Amino acid sequence: MNITKLTPWFLFSCLILLSDYIKVNSSISPSSEQTQEDGFFGFKPTKLFVFGDSYADTGNTPFLIVPSWRFPNGITFPGIPTGRFSDGRVSTDYLAKYIGVRTPITYKWGKYGRPRLAVKRGMNFAYGGAGAFETMFKLVPTASVQIDSFEQLLMRNVYSPADLNSSVAFFSIIGNDYLTYDRRNGSEEGRSALTRKVVKQILLDVKRIKDLGVRKVLVALSPPQKCLPKLVTPKGCDTNDTSTYLHNSLLRKGLIKLNDKEINNNDKSFMTLDLYNAFVTIFKNKGVSGVSTFPDPFKACCATKRGTFCGDRSLSGKKLYTLCDDPKSFFFWDNVHISDQGWRSVFSLLLPDSQF
């Protein structure tokens, strides 16, 4: 079946059925053994709010403008495309599972405050292609605009102060600002200034989320940008990328300062999710116990040529991608995004008490 020819109404109907499927499927919801009483955050969150890009997006980005709604995305879970840029789950799903809540509803479906039960679990505002500033993906809201949407819900009393006090926010702006800079032929000399500008905006954004009442904010550090399949050279990947190092260094220092300004700075309001060290550990693993091993960690399961994406087809319907036989043996799903098994490995490293 050529899914690109399906009508929007048919796809909408599929999504409604999918939402019911996810509600009853145990693999996306927490088990009693995985529920954390205190755990990573020091308290038991009951809600998760998510802001960011395609590493966290669970279906906000419109299916008319991105290939994440096309086969083979979603083949591992739940079996059909859900708008995730992966064969299955993404970072948001695994974080929600660790916390002990169901994956939060996307803003696209929950922005009207309904269904109430689903909205009460939190909400995902992340869009694929988003950045700290406007990126080359013109129709995608920046992180600041995503927070605007969150604030509008608060003004409508969709969430109470008590709701927010039992919540965690996940902020994942990884690299679209830098990708846009490269596409526009930005100079290497100007990259440092851009990095400082991006990090400054991220710090403003996460502080704003905290000021709106969210109890804690988890901020993703950037993984090694030059290790993406689309950028890896025959010599391998550059894990000592100075640009990524500067981004993470400035972000860490900025978050420390924000924590120091908190009234109760023993209860750290701003935390980091160290994707950089998790990725590097997995890339360099040669069989260390407890760390997943991938035969070729820099190779994409859904491989494409320059200018095409996983799920793309020609006008005649010919596939413009090559699909691997076993997605579980690949860390990367496509040239940029992580596979379900890849994300499982990352969170197993970062949250060692978890059972994914």
From Swiss-Prot:
Keywords: Glycoprotein, Hydrolase, Lipid degradation, Lipid metabolism, Secreted, Signal. GO terms for cellular component: extracellular region; secretory vesicle. One of its GO terms (biological process) is lipid catabolic process. It comes from the Eukaryota. InterPro entries: GDSL (IPR001087), SGNH_hydro_sf (IPR036514), SGNH_plant_lipase-like (IPR035669). Residues 1-26 form the signal peptide. Coiled coil: none annotated. Its main location: secreted. One of its GO terms (molecular function) is hydrolase activity, acting on ester bonds. Glycans are attached at N25, N165, N185, N240. It is an enzyme of class 3 (hydrolase). The active site is at S54, D334, H337. It is found in: Secreted. Its EC number is 3.1.1.-. Belongs to the 'GDSL' lipolytic enzyme family. This is GDSL esterase/lipase At2g36325. The lineage of its organism: Eukaryota, Viridiplantae, Streptophyta, Embryophyta, Tracheophyta.
